Amino acid sequence: MPSTTGIMASRISRVLAFALLFAGDIVSAQSFKIDSDDDITSAARSLADNVMTYYHGNESGQTPGILPGPPPAGDYYWWEGGALWGAMIDYWHYTGDTTYNDVVTEAMLWQVGPNKDYMPPNVTASLGNDDQGFWGMSAMLAAEVNFPDPPSDQPQWLALAQAVFNTQADPGRHDTTCGGGLRWQIPFANNGYNYKNSIANGCFFNLGARLARYLNNQTYADWADKTWDWVQSVGFMDADYRIYDGAHVESNCTDINRAQFSYNNAVFLLGAAYMFNYTDGDSKWEDRVNGLLDATIRDFFRNNVAYEIACEEHMTCTTDMLSFKGYVHRWMTTMTQIAPFTAEKVLPLLQTSAQAAVNQCTGPPDGTTCGFQWTSGTFDNSVGAGQTMNVLGAVSSLLVGRARAPVTNATGGTSAGDPNAGSSSDSFTNTPVPITTGDRVGAGILTALILGSALGTFVWMSTGK
């Protein structure tokens, strides 16, 4: 571990104190206050209650683990359930509130699938590496924050994260097209199998970096190194640390879709911070963290407030995109714990952005409903699980100064691992299944909006203008 880790808590506390004082000059929200730890905890509790109103998997006749969907049955694809549980695990970690822990555990275990690798058969027709990766990252988070372990006869958090990583590291998912890298979709029959993208590889990179640190295992770190290098070499990440969406294998990944999404930056930024920590402060990873951090602030914050450049100006965001700001806040916060040199720059920024987030949570019916556009200062009538998850992540992570940094198996981690997890998965020769219209329109995290890059909203990004 880097020698700076020992002074991390005091440094973060000092920066947070400054940030809270600075935020006092900002107009406070009508409903939520975040001026003190008690205020933050109270606001986070209300936001957690609000976001869980969108979840019905713990009700009779419903499927545990998923938000209503997929379309046309509801707004949400399978992956966003996994993302929700990550937000709720962080909520517990920062606040200590155990209200939803049993619901989270049931949800996370219900969706593991028969091979305990987060590939349940009922989502095969829209299963992407990124979808699986989000569930794997939530399992990894559970291990890192010592979220209560499942019963001994159930899959364990660390083993689930390893299973996801192992299935994605299998040679069956890494072909020679475009010089390597993961495809977006997993089954060859799926729409999008011919597309390689940043988020699929970013989730894999992120998991590899975190497993390397947690287990002190160089094999995972080698995969993380290799993945970062490939993403740069193929042009998905440019010299200015802009991360683009992806490209098709038929063009050898030369037809890069230049859409930029904040969760791509966030997933790579957190992974790079873990690599910095694992390598005991290697200057290569420090430079990468700094470069990507500056790019993230440059591209995805307006006046120090989180902003989704691909879609927010004209509100063309898909349901998926409406959840990205929360990952930015949550993962940048964790970065300050494992790469403490970033704290002085990041924590005041996130405090300002969180204040803007709660300022607009004034919607009906009770004046606490959150919208999506934080820079406007007013409620924008855009409501949903993603919008509320965003604010929950932004608010709860303000308590980082009193939270323990992610643990490892050498520093108090309790989750049991399995280096062979996922090895029994038949994950690369899936029998083709009929693809429905709904699957074609929106399979996985990135919807047909990405593959349909001719849509007017994305013309300027596709042409680099």
Predicted regions and their residues:
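N-terminal signal peptide
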Residues: 2, 9, 18-42, 49
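CBM-like carbohydrate-recognition segments
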Residues: 32-130, 134-136, 142-143, 149, ...
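Alpha-helical positions within canonical tetratricopeptide repeat
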Residues: 43, 99, 103, 153-156, ...
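Long alpha-helical scaffolds in large eukaryotic adaptor/regulatory proteins
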Residues: 95, 139, 146, 208, ...
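Extended ligand-binding groove/face enriched in aromatic
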Residues: 102-106, 110-208
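Active-site cradle of extracellular carbohydrate-active enzymes
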Residues: 201-215, 219-276, 289, 293-296
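Membrane-interfacial loop- and helix-cap regions that link adjacent transmembrane helices
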Residues: 249-251, 257, 284, 307-313
